[in-house]
Amino acid sequence: MACTAMVSTNAFAKEEVKAPAPLLPLPEQKQVDWQRMETYAFIHFGLNSFCDREWGYGDTDPKMFNPKRLDCEQWVKTLIAAGMKGVILTAKHHDGFCLWPFEGNDYNVSKSPWRNGKGNVVKELSEACKKHGLKFAVYLSPWDRSRADYGSPSYVDYFHSQLRDLLTNYGPVFEVWFDGANGGDGYYGGARDKRTIDRKNYYNYPRIYQILDSLQPQAVVFSDGGPGCRWVGNEKGFAGETNWAFIPKNTVYPGYPNYPELQFGYPDGDQWTAAECDVSIRPGWFYHPEEDDKVKSPEQLADLYYRSVGHNATLLLNFPVDRNGLINPVDSANAVNFHKLIQRELGNNLVAGMKPKVSNERGGQFAAQALTDGSWDTYWATSDGVTSADITFTFKKAQKMNRIMLQEYIPLGQRVKKFAVEWLDKNGTWKAVEQGEETTTIGYKRLLRFLTVETKGLRVRILDSRGPICMNNIGVYYGGEDAQLTWSPASVAIKSVPFSLKGFDEAQLTKVVDRNPATVLFADKNELLIDLGRDTKVSTLMYLPDQSENRHGLIHSYTLAACKADGTDEHVLSSGEFSNIQNNPVLQTITFEPATTRYLKLKADRMVNDGEQIGVAELGVK
């Protein structure tokens, strides 16, 4: 009888359902863990914070660094309250100044008056992170404008030794950040010249990756081409609505010239390298007092969250620490309120625990219930060969909703190529929700904002996929009647005294004073002659560059002078460079000692792109 019973039980046993085959390329587990962090912070801090620069030249005296109230615990507590899961510190920016007492040079915090030369910002922040449970990471600029040997093989050895020092003495890091800005003019030990390097090969990245794998194997490596995660191709904080986590292997590298492509990824790429969206809470990356009233609002930050994390990327939000060594209270308040806003809009999942109706189900553990159980590790999947399917939710009574969250189970690859979201009207007709984005890729997470509907039915239609569909979570939310579809920037308002431009008529002049950054005036030479109408006491010139994706006419370095009506007999008021203007084309402000003049000449000593003439979206003098 026992034998008979055993045979009977086996006869009715369910056949095990196999999981869908992985679809290459695939992420490593550390890449999955990194993307699940979603939001984390950047800290830009250094000598630049004290000399009002974005890119230091490499010649600033270390004695200028003296943040008398520096408190890394204040940073960490602020970031945690703002929902950040980690923080990346600029241990060394392009100027070469080190925020830790690196023994390989004399250009570091030990040569500053801060903490009587005994301080170590990297150590203090890493210890504060450990104490409060925030993940820690480091930014190390490959470019070094202070070093005489930059461009030679000996500098590469020096750079590698800095990396080893950071990765050995300050605990585990979740990411190592390599900037794509490499080579150009600089102090270079007093040479004050321009250095050009082979961005792809000079630093010996294969050797760098070996160092990282041996010292911090869990760390994700950031650069334009990863390999752990990639730059999104802009510094505005958003990814493309279509965004693949793939790039072509051995093609994209730090300083990659076709970087605008990176915001979309490559559907035929063979390396998993998801995008990271870096953006500052202020216009600049380092602290500038004049930007205290230009901090992004909670609504602006929320919009960036939807367009970064909600576009299959992560959000890296920069906080410029001020000259006291603290995160400014306005920055702190806006970031915390941004986190509260996201929690409010996405806090109540209307379909949690519901079992949706699906048009296809693989069966076994890959059932539709996995879509709403709140677990990352369970997922719904379709049968082999099924690359489109409908997911339908039915409510007992009508529900208001205006947000949806979709997630693919990315350990098996990114698959969905096209989808749609529909609601059931009172007449029983399915209609597309009203929203402004293309509904193509999903990836780790897709967030869609749409006009509020009140309905008893919601349907997600997966219209095309690279293989069997694998989705692990769906969330539906009502963000409130005041929840925005998107955030639109206000017009650019520049307070200015009246002026005209020599050689340009009224219609052309309008382009630089119309508060519309989309209209751009292009000069026919490399200078602008500004006529104030009469002798006027002025001390500031404001210049907004071309804001388009393929922007032109960007000034790299400039000379501003008072002059005669014909542009001669110059008295130089200011000269310098607009650092990082290509990637972060924010309003550029030139301040100088007050001068009384009728005419000003702004001359481009060097353009970002050789051969181009000056382009101006907005201009002002005061």
Residue ranges and their predicted role:
Residues 7, 357, 370, 469-470, ...:
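Intrinsic disorder/low-complexity signature
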Residues 500-521:
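Structured N-terminal alpha/beta-domain signature
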Residues 1-15:
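Bacterial Sec-dependent N-terminal signal peptides
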Residues 14-387, 392-393, 405-414, 432-450, ...:
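Mature catalytic domains of secreted/periplasmic carbohydrate-active enzymes
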Residues 330, 337, 342-348, 373-434, ...:
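Aromatic, loop-rich ligand-recognition surfaces of beta-strand-rich domains
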